[in-house]
From Swiss-Prot:
Claim: Signal is one of the keywords in the record: yes
Protein name: Apolipoprotein A-II
Positions of modified residues (Phosphoserine): 54, 68
Cross-referenced InterPro entries: ApoA-II, ApoA-II_sf
Subunit and partners: Homodimer; disulfide-linked. Interacts with NAXE and NDRG1.
GO molecular function, one term: protein heterodimerization activity
Encoding gene (name): APOA2
Organism: Pan troglodytes (Chimpanzee)
Family, per entry: Belongs to the apolipoprotein A2 family.
GO biological process: cholesterol homeostasis; cholesterol transport; lipoprotein metabolic process; peptidyl-methionine modification; positive regulation of interleukin-8 production; positive regulation of phagocytosis; protein oxidation; protein stabilization
Amino acid sequence: MKLLAATVLLLTICSLEGALVRRQAKEPCVDNLVSQYFQTVTDYGKDLMEKVKSPELQAEAKSYFEKSKEQLTPLIKKAGTELVNFLSYFMELGTQPATQ
């Protein structure tokens, strides 16, 4: 029984000592965190710019935009036509009661 009580007492003291050490530890400075964040963003931006400069990536992006333009142009024309028809329908509704 004494061994059990001594073990519980020892575990309690160790956990309290650990909590005290954690409380006394220095918290990371916010300025350092912000500067590290901006440094990381800057490094990422530099790496991205180096990757964008490659001719393969530029050619791939150009072909992607051309293909997208080919696919979207008919859809945009169709949507524009339907919008004009839709608005003209409401314009006709507005003029009908006045003529009756």
